[in-house]
UniProtKB/Swiss-Prot annotation:
UniProt keyword terms in alphabetical order: Amidation, Disulfide bond, Gamma-carboxyglutamic acid, Ion channel impairing toxin, Neurotoxin, Potassium channel impairing toxin, Secreted, Toxin, Voltage-gated potassium channel impairing toxin
Site entry: Pharmacophore: 17, 29
Domain of life: Eukaryota
Domain statement: The cysteine framework is XI (C-C-CC-CC-C-C).
Cysteines joined through disulfide linkages: 1-15, 8-20, 14-24, 19-28
Phylogenetic classification of the source organism: Eukaryota, Metazoa, Spiralia, Lophotrochozoa, Mollusca
Protein name: Kappa-conotoxin SrXIA
Length: 32
């Protein structure tokens, strides 16, 4: 899942909760 340009809430729904720390870190850009 790509989270580039996504908001923090969208990132949480798409990736892992731990990715929500201001910005999406590189390892978090691609999730399950």
């Amino acid at each position: 899942c790509r989270t580039e340009g996504m908001s923090c809430e969208e990132n949480q729904q798409c990736c892992w909760r731990s990715c929500c720390r201001g910005e999406c870190e590189a390892p978090c850009r691609f999730g399950p």
